[in-house]
C-alpha cells in the first residue's frame, strides 16, 4: 500500500490541511513540492483551491532531491515545513513525518502497489511466479530497504540481501507455499 499527500513533522502541531491557513506564517506561506508535471503537484494545486489556501500559500516546484534538501535543512533547524509526500519513500524511515488529514479527499485514499509480470510469465517460470504472488511488503519494510539503498553503498542488490537476512521469516513465507 502507499499514500500520497502533504506531510508535516512531529513538532508541527497542524494535523489537517484545513488548518494550514491559520499557520501560513509558520510555514512561510510555502508548500515545497517536486516537478510541475507530477500527479501529486496537480493535486496540490487543486488542494490550494479546495481549502482556500491560494492567497496564503505558494507552491515551490523543485525536484525531488531539492525538496529533500529543504526537508533536511528544516529538520536540522527545527522549522515548520509542509511538502508533497508519498509512501513508500525512505524519508518516512529517516524522519518523523505524518500525512496531514485531507477532509476534502483531494489526495484520495490509500493506494496499492501491485507486482506485474509479462504475459506468459506464470507458464515460463511458475516457481518464480509463485514467489512473486506470495510476496507482500508493508510500506515500513520497503522504506527501510529504500533508506539502506540511499544511505548505503548504493548497490540495491547488496542492500536487498541485507534486508532478506534481517527479515528471513518474511522471505521464508514467500518461498514456501501454504499447506
Q: Where does each model-flagged region fall?
A:
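Ligand-binding pocket segment of bilobal, Venus flytrap-like solute-binding proteins
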Residues: 35-102
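Periplasmic-binding protein-like
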Residues: 65-66, 88-139
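Sec-exported extracytoplasmic/periplasmic mature domains
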Residues: 22-25, 49-53, 72-76, 133-137, ...
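Extracytoplasmic/secreted proteins, especially bacterial periplasmic and envelope-associated proteins
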Residues: 15, 19, 39-46, 66, ...
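A bilobed periplasmic-binding-protein/Venus flytrap-type ligand-binding module shared by bacterial periplasmic
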Residues: 1-11, 111-125, 148
